[in-house]
Regions:
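Active-site activation/catalytic loop segments of kinase-like enzymes and analogous catalytic loops
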Residues: 213-241, 253-270, 281
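An alpha-helical support segment within catalytic cores of ATP-dependent transferases
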Residues: 3-22, 109, 125-181, 190-193, ...
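A conserved alpha-helical element in kinase catalytic cores
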Residues: 44-90, 97-123
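Active-site acidic catalytic loop and adjacent metal/ATP-binding pocket
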Residues: 32-40, 166-215
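Helical subdomain adjoining the active site within ATP-dependent kinase catalytic cores
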Residues: 259-297
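A glycine-centered beta->alpha junction motif in the catalytic cores
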Residues: 91-106, 125, 144-150, 254-271
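ATP-binding glycine-rich phosphate-binding loop
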Residues: 17-40
């Protein structure tokens, strides 16, 4: 274990003079800061981290201050302290283990996904009254062009052509919600004793359509090839995706797949590369494209 950053020591010391750093939890890739586990004097268990940038810090603090309450009592960590200048946060721990590290019996796994759908439905209502500027087709076209220039060299030509085709038109304009931004099993804590799911890591939470990341990532990384979990998740969410949402998910997923592939290769995040490949494979199957032929570093 390396030394916890001094900025995090200062943040914890703003809460208590007596504490113990018990573990460092590295995150995938070569630029994401570690998460630090800290024990307080009264048996408290906290996690602290230094955000990689001010936007991530602002998003996570906003989510804890305004949105996570919609999940219900005990369904997410609580913000203990934060410092904007040092981009540090300290949050309470929640019971359970990350779902992506567990191998649950099929019925338990379906229950977990149903609860994940229910919690996401609640979270998507948290900012119902907050305004959000609508994206324009011009900004979408610019985003697509920038991404293609930056990432096309890492994917086979047939995948690049597929992404161009899927992103040719801007996604349907959908209602904005408070999205989690990385709503995947790695951020779902499953307590086997309680048979209860909780949600962590809100640094990518922002006002976007539900299809932008929350639905598109889950759909094309997992649910496309797990119809049982797809049914359980949407039962918990309360409804299936509309045709417009499905269309938007496809367009967003196409760009996200290339972006994730590029980021994973550049930052040695093999898990993210694998997830990007899965997204491309599922998009190919959905659009009738040819079998994946490999990626280029």
């Amino acid at each position: 274990m390396t030394d916890m950053p001094s900025a995090l020591h200062h943040l914890v010391e703003s809460v208590t003079d007596t504490y113990a750093v018990v573990a460092e939890h590295p995150r995938p890739g070569d630029i994401r800061p570690s998460v630090w586990e800290v024990n307080g004097p009264g048996g408290e268990r906290w996690f602290g981290k230094v955000h990689a940038g001010p936007m991530l810090h602002r998003r996570e603090v906003t989510a804890y201050q305004n949105w996570t309450v919609a999940l219900g009592p005990g369904s997410a960590p609580e913000l203990v302290s934060a410092d904007t200048q040092t981009r540090t946060v300290l949050v309470t721990a929640v019971p359970g283990r990350s779902l992506d590290t567990l191998r649950l019996p099929a019925e338990q796994e379906r229950v977990a996904y149903e609860q994940a759908g229910e919690l996401l439905a609640r979270f998507h209502t948290a900012a119902a009254d907050e305004p959000m500027p609508e994206a324009t087709e011009e900004s979408w076209d610019e985003e697509v062009a920038r991404l293609m220039d930056r990432t096309a060299g890492h994917a086979p030509e047939h995948d690049v052509a597929m992404v161009r085709m899927l992103a040719k038109e801007a996604p349907p304009r959908l209602p904005q919600v408070s999205q989690h931004g990385d709503y995947m099993p790695k951020n779902w804590m499953w307590d086997e004793t309680e048979q209860r799911l909780r949600v962590i890591d809100f640094e990518r939470a922002e006002l976007r359509s539900a299809a932008y990341r929350d639905m598109s990532r889950l759909r094309y990384r997992i649910l496309c090839h797990r119809p049982d979990l797809d049914a359980a998740f949407h039962h918990g969410y309360g409804r299936p995706l509309t045709e417009e949402e499905q269309s938007a998910c496809q367009a967003y997923a196409a760009l996200d797949a290339l972006d994730s592939l590029d980021w994973g290769i550049k930052h040695r995040d093999i898990g993210l590369v694998d997830e990007a490949q899965t997204m491309l494979e599922n998009l190919r199957r959905e659009t009738g494209r040819s079998v994946w032929g490999g990626w280029r570093a």
